[in-house]
A protein has these predicted regions:
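Substrate-binding/active-site clefts of carbohydrate-active enzymes
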Residues: 3-148, 168-182, 186, 193-195, ...
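Flexible glycine/proline-enriched surface loops and loop-helix/loop-strand junctions
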Residues: 118, 149-150, 255-258
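Active-site-proximal helices and loops of the catalytic beta/alpha 8
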Residues: 60, 64, 68, 139-142, ...
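Substrate-binding and catalytic surfaces of secreted/luminal carbohydrate-active proteins
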Residues: 236-239, 250-261, 271-278
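Short amphipathic alpha-helices and their capping/turn segments at secondary-structure boundaries
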Residues: 1-5, 60, 233-240, 274-279
């Protein structure tokens, strides 16, 4: 890693996942599993398919010996329906039905941004109505950081979680681990203004820079965009985040198809729809 210039490892979620497969709510109603780690069924247990606790400790220790940081992907927005929090504290979660009778599933933006479920079996926390749930999930995050000597988190689905949660988590991390230079980066699909609203000393250090990602992908993989357009996006980006920031410029995301798939011209719209991941 050092020869490659890598100084930080981002580990995907390792919390215990369900054993069985589940049918997706939207057509074509695919059957798939929680292999990706984003369907937690236990708050503080490593999925045995990913390894053992002592093995993860060894990985982090080995990384630190080479001055390499380790951040863990943490899921705060939701759990799988087999999670004990849903079983024991149903009042911590919102309902899947909207007042007009529609299902509040994958309604990513607007008034439902903070309440939508990712699927019928992936309930989202209702943090504004259940402050005790904020305290519990924050404590879980602190447990992972302390138990495995982590250097920070990649925070999942940031825009679906209220600011009050992120402020509570960041405040707790700074108080509990004052000796650590904790780094938190978030994932938010949305406008620069929405992405930037979570980046401040009280919440996150950075987010993935999706506006530049999408535009640069169009420039370098096809003739859909021009360098002039990318230049405008970069200028707008700097206006929002400033010339000096920790925003993460990426070449790919595990939520999207690989750059090479776009560049070789083999991907059709239908393939993009079929290949989507929902976390």
């Amino acid at each position: 890693f050092q020869d490659l210039g890598v100084n930080t490892l981002w580990i995907s979620p390792i919390q215990k996942q369900p054993d069985s497969s589940w049918v997706e709510w939207v057509p074509p109603n695919r059957t798939f599993s929680g292999y990706h780690g984003y369907w937690p069924i236990e708050p503080r247990k490593i999925d045995p398919r990913f390894g053992k606790s002592e093995e993860f400790n060894s990985i982090v220790k080995s990384a630190h010996q080479t001055e390499t940081k380790v951040i863990l992907d943490f899921v705060s927005n939701h759990v799988h329906q087999d999670h004990p929090y849903l079983r024991d504290h149903k009042n911590w979660f919102g309902t899947v039905n909207l007042p007009d009778g529609r299902l509040n599933i994958r309604q990513w933006d607007g008034d439902t941004r903070l309440t939508t479920w990712f699927d019928e079996f992936i309930p989202s926390f209702d943090f504004p109505s259940a402050p005790v749930a904020i305290n519990q999930v924050v404590e879980d995050a602190m447990w992972w950081m302390g138990e495995y000597d982590l250097d920070g988190f990649r925070q999942d689905a940031v825009k679906h979680v209220p600011h009050s949660f992120w402020k509570s988590l960041t405040r707790s991390a700074k108080i509990r681990f004052p000796e650590k230079n904790i780094y938190q980066i978030g994932e938010t699909f949305g406008s620069d203004e929405l992405i930037g609203s979570y980046v401040n000393p009280a919440e996150l250090d950075a987010q993935f820079n999706f506006s530049i990602y999408f535009n640069s992908r169009g420039v370098f993989s096809s003739d859909q965009s021009k360098f002039y357009d990318l230049g405008n996006v970069i200028a707008e980006n700097r206006s929002t985040f400033g010339p000096i920031h920790l925003m993460d410029n990426i070449t790919r995301s595990h939520d999207k198809l690989r750059f090479s798939g776009h560049a070789d011209g083999q991907i059709e719209l239908s393939d993009c729809i079929l290949a989507r991941w929902y976390f």
